[in-house]
Amino acid sequence: MAVLKPKNIYYMLSYAYRVLTQGEFKNLDSEEFDNIHNLFAEIIRLGISNQIKRGLIREYEEHTDEIKTIRGKICVKYSLRGLSGKGDTITCSFDEYTLNTSMNQVLKTTMYYLIKSDEVSQTRKNKLKNLMKYFSDVELINPHLIKWSTFRYHRNNAAYKMLMNLCYLILSGMILSDTAGTHKLAEFIDDQKMHALYEKFILEYYRREFPELKAAKKEIAWDLSDADEMMISLLPKMITDITLTWENKALIIDAKYYGHSVAESVHSDKKIYLSSNLYQIQAYVKNMDKERTGNVEGMLLYAKTDDEAFNESSGVFGGNKISVRTLDLSGDWKDIDSKLKTIAKEFKESASA
Protein backbone atom coordinates (compact mmCIF):
# COMPACT_ATOMS: atom_id res chain seq x y z
CA MET A 1 0.00 0.00 0.00
CA ALA A 2 1.29 3.46 -0.90
CA VAL A 3 2.11 5.64 2.11
CA LEU A 4 -0.76 7.97 3.01
CA LYS A 5 -0.17 11.62 3.69
CA PRO A 6 -1.28 12.57 7.22
CA LYS A 7 -3.19 15.52 5.77
CA ASN A 8 -5.21 13.18 3.56
CA ILE A 9 -6.17 11.10 6.59
CA TYR A 10 -7.37 14.32 8.20
CA TYR A 11 -9.54 15.11 5.17
CA MET A 12 -10.93 11.58 5.19
CA LEU A 13 -11.74 11.91 8.89
CA SER A 14 -13.32 15.33 8.35
CA TYR A 15 -15.78 13.82 5.87
CA ALA A 16 -16.41 10.74 7.99
CA TYR A 17 -16.94 12.90 11.10
CA ARG A 18 -18.29 16.31 10.16
CA VAL A 19 -17.52 17.80 13.57
CA LEU A 20 -13.86 18.01 12.47
CA THR A 21 -14.82 20.85 10.12
CA GLN A 22 -16.27 22.94 12.94
CA GLY A 23 -14.96 25.14 15.76
CA GLU A 24 -11.29 24.83 16.69
CA PHE A 25 -10.94 21.72 14.51
CA LYS A 26 -11.13 23.95 11.41
CA ASN A 27 -7.61 25.21 12.12
CA LEU A 28 -6.25 21.71 11.42
CA ASP A 29 -6.85 22.37 7.73
CA SER A 30 -3.99 24.89 7.62
CA GLU A 31 -1.61 22.90 9.84
CA GLU A 32 1.03 20.51 8.54
CA PHE A 33 1.72 17.15 10.20
CA ASP A 34 4.82 15.05 9.59
CA ASN A 35 3.11 11.81 10.65
CA ILE A 36 -0.29 10.45 11.64
CA HIS A 37 0.68 10.25 15.31
CA ASN A 38 0.98 14.04 15.57
CA LEU A 39 -2.26 14.42 13.64
CA PHE A 40 -4.13 12.11 16.01
CA ALA A 41 -2.50 13.71 19.06
CA GLU A 42 -3.76 17.14 17.99
CA ILE A 43 -7.29 15.96 17.16
CA ILE A 44 -7.51 14.10 20.47
CA ARG A 45 -6.15 17.15 22.34
CA LEU A 46 -8.69 19.49 20.76
CA GLY A 47 -11.56 17.05 21.24
CA ILE A 48 -10.79 16.37 24.89
CA SER A 49 -10.16 20.08 25.61
CA ASN A 50 -13.60 20.89 24.21
CA GLN A 51 -15.15 18.09 26.24
CA ILE A 52 -13.50 19.33 29.44
CA LYS A 53 -15.05 22.77 28.83
CA ARG A 54 -18.47 21.13 28.43
CA GLY A 55 -17.82 18.80 31.33
CA LEU A 56 -16.54 15.23 31.31
CA ILE A 57 -19.39 12.76 31.64
CA ARG A 58 -20.03 11.10 34.95
CA GLU A 59 -22.08 8.00 35.62
CA TYR A 60 -23.51 6.25 38.64
CA GLU A 61 -21.63 3.07 39.48
CA GLU A 62 -22.52 0.59 42.20
CA HIS A 63 -19.94 0.17 44.96
CA THR A 64 -19.85 -2.18 47.93
CA ASP A 65 -17.75 -1.09 50.89
CA GLU A 66 -17.42 -1.21 54.66
CA ILE A 67 -18.40 2.18 56.06
CA LYS A 68 -19.26 3.62 59.46
CA THR A 69 -22.67 5.08 58.56
CA ILE A 70 -25.46 3.50 56.55
CA ARG A 71 -25.48 4.47 52.89
CA GLY A 72 -27.60 2.87 50.18
CA LYS A 73 -28.49 -0.78 50.81
CA ILE A 74 -27.14 -2.78 53.74
CA CYS A 75 -25.44 -6.02 52.68
CA VAL A 76 -26.81 -8.15 55.53
CA LYS A 77 -24.59 -11.17 54.89
CA TYR A 78 -21.33 -9.22 55.10
CA SER A 79 -22.56 -6.87 57.83
CA LEU A 80 -23.38 -9.79 60.17
CA ARG A 81 -19.86 -11.08 59.70
CA GLY A 82 -18.52 -7.65 60.60
CA LEU A 83 -20.55 -7.53 63.80
CA SER A 84 -18.59 -10.47 65.19
CA GLY A 85 -15.42 -8.39 64.88
CA LYS A 86 -14.92 -4.76 65.75
CA GLY A 87 -18.53 -3.92 65.04
CA ASP A 88 -17.79 -0.32 64.10
CA THR A 89 -18.44 -0.68 60.36
CA ILE A 90 -21.29 -1.91 58.22
CA THR A 91 -21.15 -3.20 54.64
CA CYS A 92 -23.32 -1.22 52.25
CA SER A 93 -23.98 -1.23 48.52
CA PHE A 94 -24.46 2.27 47.10
CA ASP A 95 -24.30 4.26 43.86
CA GLU A 96 -21.44 6.68 43.40
CA TYR A 97 -21.38 9.47 40.81
CA THR A 98 -17.97 8.98 39.23
CA LEU A 99 -15.69 10.18 36.44
CA ASN A 100 -14.23 6.68 36.16
CA THR A 101 -16.50 5.70 33.26
CA SER A 102 -15.59 3.38 30.40
CA MET A 103 -15.46 6.23 27.87
CA ASN A 104 -13.26 8.41 30.08
CA GLN A 105 -10.98 5.40 30.60
CA VAL A 106 -10.67 5.12 26.81
CA LEU A 107 -9.77 8.81 26.51
CA LYS A 108 -7.11 8.59 29.22
CA THR A 109 -5.66 5.38 27.77
CA THR A 110 -5.46 6.90 24.28
CA MET A 111 -3.64 9.97 25.61
CA TYR A 112 -1.32 7.68 27.58
CA TYR A 113 -0.16 5.79 24.46
CA LEU A 114 0.20 8.95 22.41
CA ILE A 115 2.38 10.42 25.16
CA LYS A 116 4.48 7.24 25.20
CA SER A 117 4.92 7.22 21.42
CA ASP A 118 8.32 8.23 20.05
CA GLU A 119 6.54 9.61 16.97
CA VAL A 120 4.63 12.35 18.81
CA SER A 121 6.46 15.66 19.24
CA GLN A 122 7.39 16.76 22.75
CA THR A 123 5.28 19.90 22.39
CA ARG A 124 2.15 17.85 21.70
CA LYS A 125 3.04 15.41 24.47
CA ASN A 126 3.24 18.28 26.95
CA LYS A 127 -0.19 19.52 25.89
CA LEU A 128 -1.66 16.05 26.41
CA LYS A 129 0.05 15.78 29.80
CA ASN A 130 -1.69 19.00 30.85
CA LEU A 131 -5.03 17.34 30.10
CA MET A 132 -4.19 14.19 32.06
CA LYS A 133 -4.65 16.05 35.36
CA TYR A 134 -8.39 16.16 34.68
CA PHE A 135 -8.35 12.34 34.59
CA SER A 136 -6.59 11.72 37.92
CA ASP A 137 -9.60 9.74 39.18
CA VAL A 138 -9.88 7.74 35.95
CA GLU A 139 -8.19 4.36 35.52
CA LEU A 140 -6.02 3.24 32.61
CA ILE A 141 -7.25 0.08 30.89
CA ASN A 142 -5.87 -2.63 28.63
CA PRO A 143 -6.67 -1.56 25.03
CA HIS A 144 -7.43 -5.16 24.05
CA LEU A 145 -10.11 -5.49 26.74
CA ILE A 146 -12.21 -2.49 25.66
CA LYS A 147 -15.76 -3.57 24.74
CA TRP A 148 -16.36 -1.02 21.98
CA SER A 149 -19.71 -2.49 20.95
CA THR A 150 -21.21 -1.81 24.38
CA PHE A 151 -20.92 1.97 24.10
CA ARG A 152 -24.29 3.69 23.76
CA TYR A 153 -24.78 7.33 22.83
CA HIS A 154 -27.52 9.75 23.84
CA ARG A 155 -28.04 13.48 24.11
CA ASN A 156 -25.76 13.90 27.12
CA ASN A 157 -22.75 12.04 25.68
CA ALA A 158 -23.23 12.55 21.92
CA ALA A 159 -20.02 14.61 21.73
CA TYR A 160 -18.07 11.53 22.79
CA LYS A 161 -19.01 9.57 19.65
CA MET A 162 -16.39 11.08 17.34
CA LEU A 163 -13.76 10.82 20.09
CA MET A 164 -14.56 7.15 20.69
CA ASN A 165 -14.38 6.42 16.96
CA LEU A 166 -10.99 8.08 16.73
CA CYS A 167 -9.76 6.31 19.87
CA TYR A 168 -10.94 3.05 18.32
CA LEU A 169 -8.91 3.80 15.19
CA ILE A 170 -5.83 4.44 17.35
CA LEU A 171 -6.15 1.76 20.04
CA SER A 172 -7.65 -0.96 17.87
CA GLY A 173 -5.88 -0.14 14.62
CA MET A 174 -2.39 0.84 15.79
CA ILE A 175 -1.63 -0.91 19.08
CA LEU A 176 1.10 -3.55 18.89
CA SER A 177 1.91 -6.04 21.66
CA ASP A 178 5.33 -7.54 22.29
CA THR A 179 6.24 -10.83 23.95
CA ALA A 180 6.51 -9.11 27.34
CA GLY A 181 2.87 -8.06 27.10
CA THR A 182 3.57 -4.34 26.73
CA HIS A 183 1.89 -2.19 24.10
CA LYS A 184 3.01 0.57 21.78
CA LEU A 185 1.65 2.41 18.76
CA ALA A 186 2.50 1.06 15.32
CA GLU A 187 3.78 3.26 12.52
CA PHE A 188 0.66 2.79 10.41
CA ILE A 189 -3.03 2.06 10.91
CA ASP A 190 -4.13 -1.55 10.42
CA ASP A 191 -5.52 -2.12 6.89
CA GLN A 192 -8.82 -3.47 8.20
CA LYS A 193 -9.50 -0.29 10.18
CA MET A 194 -8.36 1.89 7.28
CA HIS A 195 -10.71 -0.01 4.98
CA ALA A 196 -13.65 0.96 7.20
CA LEU A 197 -12.54 4.61 7.24
CA TYR A 198 -11.97 4.62 3.46
CA GLU A 199 -15.47 3.27 2.85
CA LYS A 200 -17.13 5.75 5.23
CA PHE A 201 -15.12 8.63 3.77
CA ILE A 202 -16.31 7.97 0.20
CA LEU A 203 -19.93 7.59 1.30
CA GLU A 204 -19.90 10.83 3.31
CA TYR A 205 -17.98 12.66 0.58
CA TYR A 206 -20.75 12.05 -1.94
CA ARG A 207 -23.45 12.82 0.60
CA ARG A 208 -21.90 16.22 1.25
CA GLU A 209 -20.57 17.20 -2.19
CA PHE A 210 -23.31 15.66 -4.35
CA PRO A 211 -26.50 15.47 -2.25
CA GLU A 212 -28.57 15.14 -5.42
CA LEU A 213 -27.04 11.68 -5.99
CA LYS A 214 -28.60 10.39 -2.74
CA ALA A 215 -25.49 8.43 -1.70
CA ALA A 216 -26.44 5.57 0.60
CA LYS A 217 -25.72 2.02 1.63
CA LYS A 218 -28.40 -0.20 0.15
CA GLU A 219 -29.43 -3.77 0.74
CA ILE A 220 -30.03 -5.66 -2.49
CA ALA A 221 -32.52 -8.51 -2.58
CA TRP A 222 -31.42 -11.66 -4.35
CA ASP A 223 -33.12 -12.06 -7.73
CA LEU A 224 -34.69 -15.44 -7.01
CA SER A 225 -37.39 -16.97 -9.16
CA ASP A 226 -38.05 -19.92 -6.89
CA ALA A 227 -36.47 -20.55 -3.51
CA ASP A 228 -37.63 -22.03 -0.25
CA GLU A 229 -37.24 -20.30 3.12
CA MET A 230 -34.20 -22.41 3.99
CA MET A 231 -32.36 -21.24 0.86
CA ILE A 232 -33.27 -17.61 1.53
CA SER A 233 -32.11 -17.79 5.17
CA LEU A 234 -28.72 -19.20 4.14
CA LEU A 235 -27.94 -16.56 1.51
CA PRO A 236 -25.58 -13.76 2.62
CA LYS A 237 -26.95 -10.23 2.69
CA MET A 238 -25.85 -7.98 -0.14
CA ILE A 239 -25.25 -4.48 1.24
CA THR A 240 -23.49 -1.97 -0.97
CA ASP A 241 -20.73 0.32 0.30
CA ILE A 242 -22.02 3.29 -1.68
CA THR A 243 -24.91 3.56 -4.15
CA LEU A 244 -25.39 6.75 -6.18
CA THR A 245 -28.73 7.38 -7.89
CA TRP A 246 -29.49 9.82 -10.69
CA GLU A 247 -32.76 9.84 -12.63
CA ASN A 248 -33.47 6.16 -13.35
CA LYS A 249 -29.89 4.93 -13.08
CA ALA A 250 -27.70 3.71 -10.23
CA LEU A 251 -23.96 3.38 -9.68
CA ILE A 252 -22.81 0.86 -7.08
CA ILE A 253 -19.34 1.68 -5.74
CA ASP A 254 -17.45 -1.04 -3.91
CA ALA A 255 -14.65 0.61 -1.93
CA LYS A 256 -11.53 -1.53 -1.59
CA TYR A 257 -8.55 -0.81 0.64
CA TYR A 258 -6.10 -3.68 0.18
CA GLY A 259 -2.36 -4.18 0.21
CA HIS A 260 -2.75 -5.66 -3.29
CA SER A 261 -5.40 -5.04 -5.93
CA VAL A 262 -4.16 -7.54 -8.54
CA ALA A 263 -3.06 -11.16 -8.41
CA GLU A 264 -0.85 -13.53 -10.39
CA SER A 265 -2.76 -15.50 -13.01
CA VAL A 266 -2.55 -19.28 -12.55
CA HIS A 267 -2.53 -19.66 -16.33
CA SER A 268 0.17 -17.13 -17.26
CA ASP A 269 2.74 -14.71 -15.85
CA LYS A 270 0.52 -11.66 -16.19
CA LYS A 271 -1.29 -9.80 -13.43
CA ILE A 272 -5.08 -9.95 -13.26
CA TYR A 273 -7.80 -8.26 -11.22
CA LEU A 274 -8.86 -10.08 -8.06
CA SER A 275 -11.65 -12.34 -9.28
CA SER A 276 -13.56 -12.33 -5.98
CA ASN A 277 -13.98 -8.55 -6.18
CA LEU A 278 -15.25 -8.71 -9.76
CA TYR A 279 -17.68 -11.50 -8.91
CA GLN A 280 -18.97 -9.50 -5.95
CA ILE A 281 -19.63 -6.26 -7.83
CA GLN A 282 -21.19 -8.18 -10.71
CA ALA A 283 -23.52 -10.00 -8.30
CA TYR A 284 -24.60 -6.67 -6.79
CA VAL A 285 -25.25 -5.12 -10.20
CA LYS A 286 -27.12 -8.08 -11.68
CA ASN A 287 -29.35 -8.58 -8.65
CA MET A 288 -30.23 -4.87 -8.49
CA ASP A 289 -30.93 -4.70 -12.23
CA LYS A 290 -33.64 -7.35 -12.12
CA GLU A 291 -35.32 -6.07 -15.31
CA ARG A 292 -32.01 -6.26 -17.24
CA THR A 293 -32.29 -2.63 -18.34
CA GLY A 294 -28.58 -1.86 -18.13
CA ASN A 295 -29.40 1.10 -15.88
CA VAL A 296 -27.25 -0.19 -13.03
CA GLU A 297 -23.47 0.29 -13.19
CA GLY A 298 -20.78 -1.05 -10.90
CA MET A 299 -17.38 0.29 -9.88
CA LEU A 300 -14.50 -1.14 -7.88
CA LEU A 301 -12.77 1.87 -6.34
CA TYR A 302 -9.39 0.79 -4.97
CA ALA A 303 -7.17 2.85 -2.73
CA LYS A 304 -4.08 2.94 -4.95
CA THR A 305 -1.37 0.46 -4.03
CA ASP A 306 2.22 0.05 -5.13
CA ASP A 307 1.19 -2.46 -7.82
CA GLU A 308 2.82 -1.09 -10.97
CA ALA A 309 0.80 -3.37 -13.23
CA PHE A 310 -2.55 -1.98 -12.14
CA ASN A 311 -4.51 -0.30 -14.91
CA GLU A 312 -7.88 1.40 -14.74
CA SER A 313 -10.41 0.01 -17.18
CA SER A 314 -14.09 -0.57 -17.83
CA GLY A 315 -16.28 -2.92 -19.81
CA VAL A 316 -19.87 -4.00 -20.36
CA PHE A 317 -20.70 -7.32 -18.72
CA GLY A 318 -24.02 -8.75 -19.92
CA GLY A 319 -25.43 -5.29 -20.54
CA ASN A 320 -24.09 -3.58 -17.41
CA LYS A 321 -21.03 -1.35 -17.26
CA ILE A 322 -18.38 -2.37 -14.71
CA SER A 323 -15.41 -0.06 -14.04
CA VAL A 324 -12.21 -0.41 -12.05
CA ARG A 325 -10.76 2.84 -10.72
CA THR A 326 -8.07 3.87 -8.21
CA LEU A 327 -7.76 6.68 -5.71
CA ASP A 328 -4.19 7.71 -4.85
CA LEU A 329 -4.31 8.56 -1.15
CA SER A 330 -0.58 9.32 -1.14
CA GLY A 331 -1.05 12.21 -3.59
CA ASP A 332 -2.32 15.75 -3.19
CA TRP A 333 -5.80 16.20 -1.76
CA LYS A 334 -6.87 18.31 -4.75
CA ASP A 335 -6.22 15.30 -7.00
CA ILE A 336 -8.27 13.00 -4.75
CA ASP A 337 -11.08 15.54 -4.68
CA SER A 338 -10.91 15.97 -8.46
CA LYS A 339 -11.03 12.20 -9.06
CA LEU A 340 -14.13 11.72 -6.89
CA LYS A 341 -15.84 14.67 -8.56
CA THR A 342 -15.03 13.27 -12.01
CA ILE A 343 -16.59 9.91 -11.10
CA ALA A 344 -19.81 11.65 -10.02
CA LYS A 345 -19.96 13.94 -13.06
CA GLU A 346 -19.32 11.12 -15.53
CA PHE A 347 -22.07 9.05 -13.89
CA LYS A 348 -24.54 11.95 -14.13
CA GLU A 349 -23.67 12.51 -17.79
CA SER A 350 -24.06 8.80 -18.50
CA ALA A 351 -27.41 8.66 -16.69
CA SER A 352 -28.71 11.72 -18.54
CA ALA A 353 -27.65 10.48 -21.99
Each model region followed by its residue ranges:
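Terminal, charged accessory segments of proteins
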Residues: M1-H183, A353
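Glycine- and acidic
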Residues: F25-K26, S149, K184-I189, S261-K270
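Short amphipathic alpha-helical patches
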Residues: I67-G72, K133-D137, D190-M194, E229-M230, ...
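Contiguous, non-catalytic segments that form substrate-binding/exosite surfaces or channel walls
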Residues: N165, I175-A180, L185-A186, D190, ...
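Catalytic core segments in nucleotide and nucleic-acid processing enzymes
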Residues: D191-A353
